[in-house]
Each structure stands twice: as structure tokens, then as C-alpha cells.
């Protein structure tokens, strides 16, 4: 999109960031979910494209993803978190998982707004703690199809996330 400069002329800005979110399970299809990840990674490397990979909790605990992601050059690839709730993120807090699979696309199971403020904070802390355990730092980027204001405020203040 052209940008108007102070002198009244236009300059062209080219900004592109490819964002891929990674899940540990996909119950809606029989597709091997590792294959699309490997293909996305291949295409980004082949075309020298920068991008971000956001890991859902079940992907964060999958060494297939994390072993590959840890080896990527940080100047080309950013690693962050995808904050949808999965069964394995509920278990440590005694929260009953009511989804049909270990990840369920229905909002009353997978979106943070379905849980109390206290549970949302605990889930965020678990997600960020475990990310740091794997990668050695807290993520700066976070994504979700739907994220509530309380979780955004909590995460922004505690973990200094700067990209949603």
C-alpha cells in the first residue's frame, strides 16, 4: 500500500510476514499435520521469506516441531505461541476437559473466554513457562482466533508480548 510522505510524494512499502500456527492434533482430517509444516518451512527457506510459527500447547510439547524450530535462524524465523485451549493445558489445573477430542474447534472448549480469569492466567503462565523451558526465552508474539481482553492485559503486562 502506498504511503504518503511529508513531501507529498508516495513511496511503496512492502511488508509481509507469513504466520503459520501449529497444532499437535487435527481431528477433522486424516492428514499428517507434520507434512504441511515441513512444506511451509521448505517454501519459506527456498524463497527466503521471513515468517512466524505460533505453537499451540500440544505442538509445544511435541519434539517433532520443537527440535526443528530450535535450529531455525532467528533472523528469518520467529517462534511464538498460539493460545487455544487443549486438553493437556487443562489437566495441570484440574479443569475438566469437555471437548470431543484433545483439541476441539468449538469455541466453548478452545477459546480462553470459556474459562474463569484465574484459570486463564494459570494457562497463560503454563504456556509461557513451558515455551521458555523449550526455547530459553519468552515468546514476543501470540496469536489466537479469539482472545479475551483479560488474557491480553495479563499476558502483555507479565510477559511483555508486543505482537498479537
Residue ranges and their predicted role:
Residues 2-140, 146-164:
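Catalytic alpha-helical scaffold of carbohydrate-active enzymes acting on polysaccharides/glycoconjugates
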Amino acid at each position: 500500500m502506498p504511503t504518503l510522505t511529508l513531501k507529498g510524494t508516495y513511496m511503496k512499502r512492502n511488508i509481509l510476514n507469513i504466520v503459520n500456527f501449529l497444532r499437535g492434533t487435527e481431528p477433522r482430517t486424516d492428514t499428517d499435520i507434520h507434512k504441511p509444516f515441513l512444506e511451509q518451512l521448505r517454501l519459506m527457506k527456498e524463497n527466503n521469506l521471513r515468517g512466524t510459527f505460533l505453537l499451540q500447547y500440544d505442538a509445544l510439547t511435541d519434539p517433532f516441531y520443537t527440535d526443528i524450530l530450535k535450529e531455525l535462524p532467528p533472523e528469518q524465523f520467529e517462534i511464538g505461541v498460539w493460545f487455544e485451549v487443549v486438553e493437556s493445558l487443562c489437566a495441570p489445573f484440574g479443569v475438566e476437559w469437555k471437548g470431543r477430542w484433545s483439541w476441539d474447534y468449538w469455541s466453548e472448549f478452545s477459546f480462553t473466554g470459556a474459562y474463569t480469569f484465574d484459570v486463564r492466567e494459570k494457562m497463560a503462565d503454563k504456556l509461557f513457562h513451558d515455551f521458555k523451558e523449550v526455547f530459553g526465552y519468552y515468546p514476543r508474539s501470540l496469536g489466537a482466533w479469539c482472545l479475551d481482553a483479560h488474557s491480553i492485559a495479563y499476558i502483555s503486562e507479565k510477559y511483555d508480548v508486543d505482537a498479537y
